UniProtKB/Swiss-Prot annotation:
Organism of provenance: Bos taurus (Bovine)
Designated gene of the protein: U2AF1L4
GO BP field: mRNA splicing, via spliceosome
Family statement: Belongs to the splicing factor SR family.
A cellular component annotation (GO) from this entry: cytoplasm
Region (Disordered): 186-220
Source organism phylogeny: Eukaryota, Metazoa, Chordata, Craniata, Vertebrata
InterPro entries named among the record's database cross-references: Nucleotide-bd_a/b_plait_sf (IPR012677), RBD_domain_sf (IPR035979), RRM_dom (IPR000504), RRM_dom_euk (IPR003954), U2AF_small (IPR009145), Znf_CCCH (IPR000571)
Protein name per UniProt: Splicing factor U2AF 26 kDa subunit
Amino acid sequence: MAEYLASIFGTEKDKVNCSFYFKIGACRHGDRCSRLHNKPTFSQTIVLLNLYRNPQNTAQTADGSHCHVSDVEVQEHYDNFFEEVFTELQEKYGEIEEMNVCDNLGDHLVGNVYVKFRREEDAERAVVELNNRWFNGQAVHAELSPVTDFRESCCRQYEMGECTRGGFCNFMHLRPISRDLRRQLYGRGPRRRSPPRSHTGHRPRERNRRRSPDHRHGRF
């Protein structure tokens, strides 16, 4: 019996533990979920909840109407955000194997930043210290995440451009970084497994480009 329970732990057959929380580190039901959310006591991965704000979702004019932000501007804003968060966390806490940002719209996933460190102790220290910090005018909410294999967490239909659930899909829609930034960040140290897929639809990113004033205030 014990072997059977262990074999179904975190799967759809498990009637006690939430399979979505086990795979994705988040569940749309939150505390109201009928199944248990077993938060890890140690993990290589942390999640910074709702940290990234897509300007296409938040840009408004003074009268409350939405203003247009081009895809190129959004990618540049995102690359700046990704580079700053990745660089600062790696410099302060230790080597990062992988960092991913959700582009979903559901409250439990929107703007979540998942950072997988090489060492569990680095992840633990990051959670403790980051929960006392602010970023871009908002308090940082960090916790250890059960996610270690993002291949199990991602929406395969989204990656093929076929997801019919849109931004409210319950699997991760990971926003890609530009190819140039990927080489810049993941080429600094030993080759890491499964870095974020590069975005090839925009012009190459210039290194050391001047950041916008709003972005300079985003530091932890």
